[in-house]
Curated annotation (Swiss-Prot):
Top-level EC class as recorded in UniProt: transferase
Subcellular location: Cytoplasm
Recorded catalytic activity of this chain's protein: L-homoserine + ATP = O-phospho-L-homoserine + ADP + H(+)
PANTHER family per the UniProt record, alphabetical: HOMOSERINE KINASE, HOMOSERINE/4-DIPHOSPHOCYTIDYL-2-C-METHYL-D-ERYTHRITOL KINASE
UniProt keyword terms in alphabetical order: Amino-acid biosynthesis, ATP-binding, Cytoplasm, Kinase, Nucleotide-binding, Threonine biosynthesis, Transferase
Protein name: Homoserine kinase
Protein's organism: Thermoplasma volcanium (strain ATCC 51530 / DSM 4299 / JCM 9571 / NBRC 15438 / GSS1)
Enzyme nomenclature, EC number: 2.7.1.39
Domain of life: Archaea
GO molecular function: ATP binding; homoserine kinase activity
Biological function: Catalyzes the ATP-dependent phosphorylation of L-homoserine to L-homoserine phosphate.
Gene Ontology terms: biological process: threonine biosynthetic process
Length: 309
């Protein structure tokens, strides 16, 4: 007999990290989604500001796939409280899908391990981006820095050195169907030279984040393929990146499909000066901007305070 009700929270995330398109992501504690699941007469979604039809909602699609695969006969009511800003490149859709997969697994005692939940949450991303990419959902499920394998949809958590700090530059810039559009700009093929450069950068970035090597991370946080293709959407990006580096930051990349930017910095960075100069860039373009300085987060977890209807 399944439990009657439970609630979980799932962290935001930044994907790609420059050269690691659909391969790298990192979970942060800046924002969380909370998802409540309980038995009901049918599958129902309750949420504000996002689609509530199960087949158009990331949590709903995740639930539909799990219901199908495990022959779940009970109805499920899924209530979603969006703590993660939607459409800003912070893994909002993936967080809801991750939370739904984790909650349904626990509600019905399905016995799945965290790594097994990734494929179900990735299915949910179809509702947002049109493709089941597992990078954000892997970070929200496992926490930490994740390396994703598209084959078989699996991921591995890697611990990040405490030498580094993180700044999220969050522009209040909404673009309709942004993730689908941003993914449509990605080239279908690349030259061998670009492939070798990005492979080297991904290796440098992972090794540097693990070991605390500033130079490796700085080298790794660059990309001439996906970010270059998407640059017209975010005309401020290069100026923000250059300003961050001039202020002593380790590096800067577009967070996921943007418009948010992730800056990695350390004790050599003139942080206040950097934030002040970056703010001026956005002010000059008439764009509102906010900043967050998150810690690396653990993955989705159950909480004791269910959402009120």
């Amino acid at each position: 007999m399944p439990s009657m009700e439970l609630s979980v929270i799932s962290p935001c995330s930044s994907a790609n990290l420059g050269p690691g398109y659909d391969v790298l992501a990192i979970a942060f504690d800046a924002f969380y989604d909370q998802v409540n699941v309980m038995l009901s007469d049918k599958l129902r979604i309750l949420a504000d500001e996002i689609p509530v039809q199960p087949d158009k909602n990331t949590a709903g699609l995740t639930a539909l796939k799990m219901i199908e695969d495990f022959g779940i006969k009970d109805g499920i009511k899924i209530s979603i409280k969006k703590g993660i800003p939607y459409g800003l490149g912070l893994g909002s859709s993936g967080s809801s899908a991750a939370a739904a997969a984790y909650a349904i697994n626990n509600l019905f005692a399905l016995g799945l391990e965290r790594k097994d939940l990734i494929k179900y949450a990735a299915v949910g991303e179809l509702a947002s981006s049109g493709s089941p990419h597992p990078d954000n959902v892997s970070a929200s499920i496992l926490g930490g820095l994740v390396i994703v394998s598209p084959e078989g949809i699996s991921a591995k958590r890697i611990e990040v050195s405490d030498q580094f700090k993180f700044l999220l530059v969050i522009a209040d810039l909404k673009i309709r169907d942004k993730t689908k559009y941003a993914r449509s700009l990605v080239p279908s093929g690349v030259s061998m030279g670009d492939h070798k450069r990005n492979t080297s950068r991904v290796a440098s970035l992972i090794a540097g984040l693990m070991s605390g090597d500033r130079e490796l991370v700085s080298t790794g946080m660059n990309d001439d393929i996906v970010e270059a293709a998407r640059e017209p959407i975010f005309p401020y990006y290069r100026r923000v990146k250059d300003t961050a580096i001039e202020s002593g930051a380790v590096g800067a990349v577009v967070s996921g499909a943007g418009p948010s930017i992730l800056v990695v910095y350390d004790n050599k960075t003139e942080t206040k000066q950097m934030i002040r100069k970056i703010s001026r860039i956005y002010e000059g373009m008439g764009i509102s901007v906010n900043f967050a300085t998150p810690n690396v987060a653990d993955g989705v977890r159950e909480v004791a305070n269910p959402l009120a209807d």
